[in-house]
Amino acid sequence: MKTEPIHRTSMWKFKLSAATMTLIPAAVGINYVAKALAEGLKLPVWLGSLGTFLASMLAGPVAGAISGFINNVIYGLTLSPISTVYAITSIGIGIAVGVLHANGWFSSARRVFVSAIIIAFVSAVISTPLNVIFWGGQTGIAWGDSLFAVMVANHAPVWLASFTDE
């Protein structure tokens, strides 16, 4: 099912319409609640980008990037200060989802699967250096950090272990 963009003629043009001004805070709220829920329940998934996906698909990559960035800043100021650093990852996710959606990559199950791999790769490429700098390569997710520990114990490079941890 193809969704129509909100007041957008080009993927990169951004019009701050009433719909977009409503969508961005809604997306930030969805991100915030989903991220807090996932962290609170210690779920082995990152749910803090659901609103970013929504904004990117409905209003384009710029709106998605803005909503992801704002969420990380607000989350960082209220619940988890390190979250602010990962705002750049949310920007990358918003751009990737928006570009893929604008080019029809969410039109079939197969394309959605490929899109998920691309988005995960973008997220991991951006997050890995941040994880190495701030956490020694770990992510804070138990199963990923276990894999990281096994790889490092077997003399794998920290960068590779951290990327795999993602």
Task: Report the location of each language-model feature.
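Membrane-embedded alpha-helical hairpins and interfacial helices in multi-pass inner-membrane proteins
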Residues: 37-46, 84-85, 108-166
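A broad structural signal for alpha-helix termini and local helix breaks/kinks
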Residues: 58-59, 78, 104, 134
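Membrane-interface helix-loop junctions in multi-pass transporters/channels
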Residues: 75-81
